[in-house]
């Protein structure tokens, strides 16, 4: 294996180019089960006919677990967002709406994962109980949810085709919760106006009621606390206080 160059560096993982292959090498925080789960999610999305890089193998590189996939040559929507925000937001929303209409393979339940993560936070017990109860009372749906649908996880290749990357958080559940997380991600990155535009665009393309997204936001934000870095966690807590959750 010839790791030609680094393509991307993310939290505790590094993505390398190996000829026509992409090698995602995970850091020590990821165990075997985490990596195999992500590879399985990606393979199931691929088998469902979604635009996903093929999983070629899972192995160990220099003592670290790695997923090897087809290399997609192109740019992420995050790289083009600044020069064409409206076009990127429209394209992103259309892709997520299409994703939620796709046949859903066997995946973990989103609501179970969300409840588990809310329970793991340091929020007051009464707040955790209330938020978990809200999750359980939301409509039960079985849509394919990416779980981390953001501009940096959508790549446009040389032919203009969009590909979905990073399937670690994939689950089945309410697409409105998935879209709410995308809105929250945009807002936490300082793109509040784009988050509002995205919500409107997604609701139009998917036929989702805007209120559904709004109702999911507090639970999505609370569940995000467990994996957020310090700065993002502070922003999430500030926002949860502003809307009266904490």
Language model: regions and residue ranges:
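The N-lobe alphaC helix and its flanking beta3-alphaC-beta4 segment of protein kinase-like domains
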Residues: 32-48
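Active-site acidic catalytic loop and adjacent metal/ATP-binding pocket
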Residues: 14-17, 132-177
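Short beta-strand micro-motifs within the conserved protein kinase catalytic domain, predominantly
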Residues: 54-65
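An alpha-helical support segment within catalytic cores of ATP-dependent transferases
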Residues: 101-147, 157-158, 242
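Internal "kinase-insert"/substrate-recognition segments embedded within catalytic cores
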Residues: 80-111
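ATP-binding glycine-rich loop module of kinase domains
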Residues: 6-35, 78
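Conserved short submotifs of the Hanks-type protein kinase catalytic core
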Residues: 63-75
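Helix-rich C-terminal or lid/interface subdomains of diverse kinases
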Residues: 74, 181-246
């Amino acid at each position: 294996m010839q790791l030609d160059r680094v393509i991307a560096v993310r939290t505790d993982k590094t993505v390398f180019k190996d000829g026509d292959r992409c090698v995602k090498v995970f850091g020590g925080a990821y165990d075997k089960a985490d990596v195999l789960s992500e590879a399985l999610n990606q393979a199931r999305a691929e088998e469902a006919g979604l635009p996903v890089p093929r999983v070629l193998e899972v192995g160990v590189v220099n003592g670290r677990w790695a997923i090897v996939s087809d290399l997609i040559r192109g740019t992420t929507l995050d790289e083009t967002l600044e020069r064409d925000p409206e076009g990127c937001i429209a394209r992103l929303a259309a892709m997520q709406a299409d994703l939620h209409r796709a046949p859903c393979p066997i995946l973990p339940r989103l609501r179970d994962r969300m409840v588990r993560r809310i329970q793991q936070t340091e929020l007051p017990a009464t707040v955790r109980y209330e938020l978990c109860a809200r999750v359980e009372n939301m409509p039960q749906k079985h849509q394919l949810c990416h779980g981390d649908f953001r501009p940096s996880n959508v790549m446009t290749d040389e032919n203009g085709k969009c590909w979905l990357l990073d399937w670690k958080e994939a689950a089945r559940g309410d697409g409105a919760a998935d879209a709410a997380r995308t809105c929250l991600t945009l807002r936490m990155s300082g793109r509040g106006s784009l988050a509002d535009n995205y919500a409107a665009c997604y609701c139009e393309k998917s036929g989702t009621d805007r209120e559904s997204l709004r109702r999911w936001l507090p639970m999505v934000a609370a569940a995000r606390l467990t994996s957020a870095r310090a700065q993002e966690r502070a922003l999430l807590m500030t926002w949860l206080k502003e809307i009266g959750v904490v």
